[in-house]
From Swiss-Prot:
One of its GO terms (biological process) is cell adhesion involved in single-species biofilm formation. It comes from Salmonella typhimurium (strain LT2 / SGSC1412 / ATCC 700720). Pfam families: Fimbrial. Belongs to the fimbrial protein family. Fimbriae (also called pili), polar filaments radiating from the surface of the bacterium to a length of 0.5-1.5 micrometers and numbering 100-300 per cell, enable bacteria to colonize the epithelium of specific host organs. Residues 1-22 form the signal peptide. This is Type-1 fimbrial protein, A chain.
Length: 185
């Protein structure tokens, strides 16, 4: 009899323990973070594609020995600015101007810098060229050649490259940031 009582007690305890495990857990809510939504409504002939509004152009890695004279350049690296929902009845042409920290030696180039306390390369700047291979001074006022707009999506093509500002360069990071403005006519 003692054995039956003990067996039934153990069975009851196992049932209660199983029921406790099987019960629905109490919901818990915790803060998960913040989501920032950004955008802009524009009264213009086109809207700049979100992919074009914030992009990175990778110029690559080059040996300092490649720069032996002022004006030496690297290969041109293409990039583009895509315009969406264009209405050529509002404006027939689009042009772009870039703005950024100009190089002290050659103000037609972007000055290079580094991030995270890395060493900055010297003796080079970054040159931006439009679709006619004309250099664009990063002053926010030198516009690219006008490009005719068609209805819908338009792609404005540019290139960038390193250009020597000295006969000798030193190694390091060679980064730059530029903003751009659109002009519709």
């Amino acid at each position: 009899m003692k054995h039956k009582l003990m067996t039934s007690t153990i069975a009851s305890l196992m049932f209660v323990a199983g029921a406790a495990v099987a019960a629905d857990p109490t919901p818990v809510s915790v803060s998960g973070g913040t989501i920032h939504f950004e955008g802009k409504l524009v009264n213009a002939a086109c809207a700049v594609s979100t992919k074009s509004a914030d992009q990175t152009v990778t110029l690559g890695q080059y040996r300092t020995a490649s720069f032996t004279a002022i004006g030496n350049t690297t290969a041109q690296v293409p990039f583009s600015i895509v315009l969406n929902d264009c209405d050529p009845k509002v404006a027939a042409n689009a042009a772009v101007a870039f703005s950024g920290q100009a190089d002290n030696t050659n103000p037609n180039l972007l000055a290079v810098s580094s991030a995270d306390n890395s060493t900055t390369a010297t003796g080079v700047g970054i040159e931006i060229l439009d679709n006619t291979s004309s250099p664009l001074k990063p002053d926010g006022a030198t516009f690219s050649a006008k490009q005719s707009l068609v209805e819908g999506t338009n792609t404005l093509r540019f290139t960038a490259r390193y250009k020597a500002t000295a006969a000798a360069t030193t190694p390091g990071q060679a980064n730059a940031d530029a903003t751009f403005i659109m002009k519709y006519e």
